[in-house]
Design a protein with these regions (language model features):
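Short, acidic, metal-binding catalytic loop of nucleotide-sugar glycosyltransferases
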Residues: 55-64
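Glycine-rich, basic loop-to-helix element that forms the pyrophosphate-binding segment
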Residues: 105-132, 154-175
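Active-site-adjacent helix/loop segment of glycosyltransferases
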Residues: 296-414
Length: 496
């Protein structure tokens, strides 16, 4: 059994005409395995990153069972620019290599909710899917959608038994574990990413959630994260220094507290058992909450450094239009569509997302803590006022407002925190102490930050220090000044 779909003759001919293998140039042949993976890509309409992501999925050395592209954009929520996602799907070439379904979930409240809604729509449509190389859409055909028909074909037919089987929740008849491969629109996996993830879960049957090593979108030699640890207060401790070169120094990691949702592979049964991610974490810390829930349910969370994914981190860097940042122009290799008007690229600025990230951290802190919610909320308010004052002293008024605003927002989220606690408790089969050994102490984070600041100061000193050539020139000038001064003194003595 092929890991993904049965390779169609039409797709093979299309690939042969391009002079490449089904997985892309230079990629190894797909393996045979009983494990099935369904790739799920969530996007807010057409973004500058979507095409590269879809191309990367199409070039996997092991193909997914099918690809679901979930579009959460609509006129009502203000997301997207109106460009049909089907155009990018067709332009990326992914629909010529594997089965693609475009579904829409404009009412989704976050990444996890979008995945849940998209899977539900996919299951409903699995009985009337599109057979053939082109991507199918859940929108009805007609004059209103004539523009979209340029990138899609509308032949309707039965989905293969394999695709329909993966759309359902039962996998007993298939004799293997079903997996969901979660992808953001700004997360482009390396050709062997899915293969490495599947190899990891095949070797570690107790692992239910595995994630790849994340590297920079434009400079993949720079590390972003290799799994994450946090304090008990959900404060992240990333051991990777900004700009750190990937030399395999973190490739010995395995069990971690958290893997991000970008590129994560999760057991479909576990995803359904947990009802996906918590709705209280729509954008940030959804991976942390999901990882904790998986751990408490008695499963392992593992990072797979051999699986690599490029991540733009558009939400973190404030590059989403909803965050006040203009969308970036696509990269030179992205071949933007004429119908996609890209604004002038905005400078990445994590401060744009600070308030949302702080709200997520405080919510996660209260959700995972066993302390009384009322006391925690009062402490958050005091902490917010204090941190806001510090921000003002350091001349960061925008961050000061964000600190206080986040504390006031969480102060009104007592009900959401209770629901989050009940959610974790309802699925817990092991003691919370299993997470304790994966925590990092706040003192360790402060120590690491002091070391980083010291290293930055040393780098700044070295950068400002003169080079050897400049030192030699300065020595020559000093020698000339001494000789000149000596000559002047001798002349004065002689005249005197």
């Amino acid at each position: 059994r092929h890991l993904g779909r049965p390779v169609r003759a039409g797709a093979s001919q299309a690939q042969a005409s391009r002079g490449m293998s089904p997985a892309g140039p230079g990629a190894p042949a797909a393996r045979t395995t009983g494990t099935e993976a369904l790739a799920v890509v969530v996007t807010a309409g057409v973004t500058p990153y979507l095409r590269r992501t879809l191309r990367s999925v199409a070039r996997q050395s092991v193909e997914p069972e099918a690809v679901i592209v979930i579009d959460v954009a609509s006129r009502h929520n203000g997301l997207g620019d109106g460009t049909p996602v089907e155009e990018v799907v067709a332009a990326s070439g992914i629909d010529a290599r594997m089965r693609v379904r475009v579904v829409r979930a404009p009412d989704a409240r976050g990444f996890g909710d979008a995945v849940a809604r998209g899977l539900a729509l996919y299951s409903e449509l699995s009985g009337t899917g599109t057979r053939g190389p082109r991507a199918s859409s859940d929108r009805p055909s007609g004059a209103a959608n004539s523009k979209r028909s340029r990138g899609t074909t509308r032949r309707r037919g039965r989905v293969t038994d394999r695709e329909g089987g993966n759309a359902g929740s039962s996998r007993a008849s298939r004799g293997g574990r079903g997996w969901l491969w979660l992808l953001h629109d700004d997360a482009a996996p390396a050709p062997g990413c899915l293969e490495a993830l599947l190899a990891a879960v095949a070797e570690a049957r107790s692992a239910a959630l595995v994630g790849p090593k994340q590297v920079d979108w434009d400079e993949p030699e720079h590390l972003l994260e290799v799994g994450l640890r946090t304090t008990a207060s959900a404060r992240r401790a990333n051991d990777v220094v900004a700009g750190e070169i990937d030399q395999g120094q973190h490739d010995d990691r395995s069990d971690v507290l958290e893997v991000g949702t970008a590129g994560a592979l999760i057991d479909r049964a576990v995803w359904e058992e947990l009802d996906g991610t918590s709705p209280e974490f729509p954008v940030f810390n959804d991976g942390l909450e999901l990882s904790r829930a998986v751990r408490l349910a008695g499963h392992r969370v593992v990072v797979v450094p051999q699986a690599v994914i490029r991540h733009r981190r558009a939400s973190y860097l404030g590059l989403r239009p909803s965050q006040g940042g203009a969308p970036e122009r696509p990269a030179a290799d992205a071949d933007p569509l004429p119908s996609a008007p890209w604004a002038r690229a905005a400078d990445p600025d994590p401060d744009r997302s600070f308030r949302a990230r702080r709200i997520a951290q405080l919510t996660a802190w209260a959700t995972f803590s066993g302390r009384p919610i009322g006391l925690l909320l009062i402490w958050f308010l005091i902490l917010g006022i204090a941190r806001s004052g510090v921000r003002l002293l350091t001349k960061s008024p925008a961050l000061a407002r964000a600190e206080l605003g986040a504390a006031l927002t969480v102060l009104r989220r007592g009900g959401a925190i209770r629901r989050g606690r009940r959610r974790l408790a309802s699925h817990a089969t092991v003691r919370r102490s299993v997470l304790t050994r994966l925590y990092v102490h706040a003192a360790d984070i402060r120590s690491v930050r002091r070391d980083r600041r010291r290293q930055e100061r040393e780098r700044a000193v070295r950068a400002a220090a003169p080079s050897e050539l400049e030192l030699r020139e300065l020595a020559v000038l000093a020698r000339r000044r001494r000789l000149s001064l000596t000559g002047v003194l001798l002349a004065v003595v002689v005249v005197a």
